[in-house]
């Protein structure tokens, strides 16, 4: 539909995400805990977004039955259509004070979006993007700078990429060690090609 989608720096929907985190956190805080511990919350999935997605029916946002959920605090694959910075801004709005165990954002860019002037320019531009994310309240980010086509080739020809390491959701792994289903989920994620 034409409704607003999380991941596009649109307060109409980003405020719903903030509300969900705040409401869940406040309800969790009211529960009795073992040894009077302080409950904390995290927004991360490792790879459970694939497993839980397989067991869950369709959702109101258009996700089909059996499809993976978004990893961590990421927008659902392809929903963040207004560029890399808009996606980062949406995630940075989530209230970290209520998620002290972390808000995981696994973020992928194609190398060219960081500039065409060489490695130094790309590194400088990436550092600027990360500085902005942290200045806006972001805390935890995993960054991949690569092309989707390379991952697709690595699925078919893993022997060509024995050391291809990617960030998944809070951890790094050799791409070949993921299950095929997990590899395809990573490939389906948004690879930002615009700022």
Curated annotation (Swiss-Prot):
Please name the SUPFAM superfamilies in this protein's record.
PFL-like glycyl radical enzymes
The protein's Enzyme Commission number: 2.3.1.54
Domain Glycine radical positions: 71-195
Q: Which residues form the signal peptide?
A: none
Segments traversing the membrane = none
Q: What class of enzyme is it?
A: transferase
Q: From the Swiss-Prot or TrEMBL record, state where the protein is found.
A: Cytoplasm
Q: Which InterPro entries match?
A: Auton_GlycylRad_Cofactor, Form_AcTrfase_GR_CS, Gly_radical, PFL_dom
MF terms (GO), sorted A to Z: formate C-acetyltransferase activity
The segment(s) forming the PFL domain are 1-64
Q: Which portions of the sequence form the region Disordered? A: 54-76
Q: List Glycine radical occurrences by residue.
A: 170
Q: Quick one: where is this thing mainly located?
A: cytoplasm
Assigned keywords, A-Z: Acyltransferase, Cytoplasm, Organic radical, Transferase
Record's GO cellular component terms: cytoplasm
Provide the catalytic activity annotation: formate + acetyl-CoA = pyruvate + CoA
Against PANTHER family, the record matches this protein to: FORMATE ACETYLTRANSFERASE, FORMATE ACETYLTRANSFERASE 1
Instruction: State the family named in the UniProt similarity comment for this chain.
Output: Belongs to the glycyl radical enzyme (GRE) family. PFL subfamily.
Q: What is this protein called?
A: Formate acetyltransferase
Species per Swiss-Prot/TrEMBL record: Chlamydomonas reinhardtii
- Gene symbol? PFL
